[in-house]
A protein has these predicted regions:
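Short helix-loop "hinge" at the ATP-lid/N-box region of the Bergerat-fold HATPase_c
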Residues: 137-139
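Conserved catalytic submotifs in the C-terminal HATPase_c
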Residues: 107-118
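Short alpha-helical segment of the dimerization/phosphotransfer core of two-component systems
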Residues: 55-60
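Acidic ATP/Mg2+-coordinating residue in the GHKL
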Residues: 165
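Conserved micro-motifs of the catalytic ATP-binding
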Residues: 75-80, 119-122
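Short beta-strand/loop element within the Bergerat-fold HATPase_c
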Residues: 145-157
C-alpha cells in the first residue's frame, strides 16, 4: 500500500499536536491544583465542575490523538513490520480487569485457548491501539453487570483474536450491513481499527455473538521463521515495560471516559 510522504503535512501535524497537548496539559495541571486545594472545602457543584473538566479534557485529548492517528494511517507509509506476541497482548488486556470491574462493574475475562506463544507480524503500537479500541467498544455496549471476553482461537490459516460482549448487540441481522455501519461509520476508533487491519493484512469482522451481544474478530496470519530474522528479538524488557505503561495509561483514560456515561 503506497502512501504520500508529505514532509510539510507531517510538520504541520506535529505542530498542531504540540499546541493542543500543551494546552491540555496546562488545563490538567490547574485542575489538579484546584482539586488538591479544594478537596475538603469545595461544595458539591464545584467538585462536580472540576470532575467535568477532567473528563472532558480527557475526551478532547483522546479525540485529538485519534484524529492524528487517523491522519497518519491514511497518509503515511506503513512502519516496518515487527514480530509481536499476541499472548503478551492478551496478558495486558487481562491486567485491566480489576479497574474495569471497580469502575464500571463489568467483568472482563481473557482466555488464551491453550496458546502459550503466538508470533505475528505487525506494528506493536498499532496492535495495542486496535485491541484497546475493540475493548472500549465492547464496554460501551454493556451495562453494569455485563461481561466482556477477550480470547485467542487457533485457525487453519492463523490465529483469531476475539473481543466479545453480552451487551446491546448489533442493530442489523445482515453481516454486510453490520460491517458497513460499525466499520465505516463516523466513529474514529472503529475507522482506525479498520485501517490498522487493512494496512497490516489482518482481517477484521463484526458479527452477532451467540447468546446475545457482539463479537469482533481479527484474524492474524502466523509469522513464519523467515519473517523473524535471528537478530530480531521478539521481546525486549525495557521496550515491553514502556509499552505496558503506555497501554495502561491509554486504558485508564478510556475507563475514565466510560465511567462518565
Amino acid at each position: 500500500m503506497r502512501r504520500r510522504n508529505d514532509g510539510a503535512g507531517g510538520s504541520l501535524r506535529e505542530e498542531f499536536g504540540d499546541v493542543c497537548f500543551h494546552a491540555l496539559g496546562i488545563i490538567d495541571q490547574n485542575r489538579e491544583y484546584l482539586q488538591m486545594h479544594l478537596l475538603a472545602s469545595a461544595d458539591l457543584p464545584t467538585r462536580q465542575a472540576l470532575s467535568d473538566i477532567q473528563i472532558e479534557s480527557a475526551r478532547l485529548d483522546r479525540t485529538i490523538r485519534n484524529a492524528i492517528t487517523l491522519y497518519q494511517l491514511e497518509n503515511e507509509e506503513l512502519s516496518e513490520l515487527q514480530p509481536l506476541d499476541l499472548c503478551s497482548l492478551l496478558e495486558k488486556a487481562g491486567r485491566l480487569a480489576p479497574d474495569i470491574q471497580r469502575s464500571l462493574e463489568i467483568t472482563l475475562t481473557t482466555e488464551s485457548g491453550g496458546i502459550e506463544h503466538c508470533a505475528v507480524m505487525g506494528v506493536p503500537d498499532e496492535a495495542e491501539q486496535l485491541l484497546l479500541h475493540l475493548i472500549s467498544n465492547a464496554l460501551r455496549a454493556c451495562d453494569a453487570g455485563g461481561r466482556v471476553w477477550v480470547s485467542l482461537k487457533q485457525k487453519k490459516t492463523g490465529v483469531a483474536l476475539r473481543v466479545e460482549d453480552n451487551g446491546c448487540g448489533l442493530m442489523e441481522e445482515d453481516p454486510i450491513e453490520n460491517n458497513r455501519r460499525f466499520l465505516s461509520g463516523a466513529k474514529l476508533g472503529l475507522r482506525i481499527c479498520k485501517l490498522i487491519c487493512r494496512r497490516a493484512g489482518w482481517k477484521l469482522t463484526l458479527t452477532a455473538r451467540p447468546g446475545g451481544g457482539t463479537r469482533a474478530q481479527v484474524v492474524f496470519p502466523l509469522a513464519s521463521c523467515e519473517d523473524i530474522p535471528p537478530e530480531m528479538e521478539l521481546h525486549s524488557g525495557e521496550e515491553n515495560d514502556i509499552r505496558a505503561a503506555r497501554f495502561a495509561s491509554r486504558a485508564a483514560q478510556e475507563i475514565l471516559l466510560l465511567r462518565r456515561y
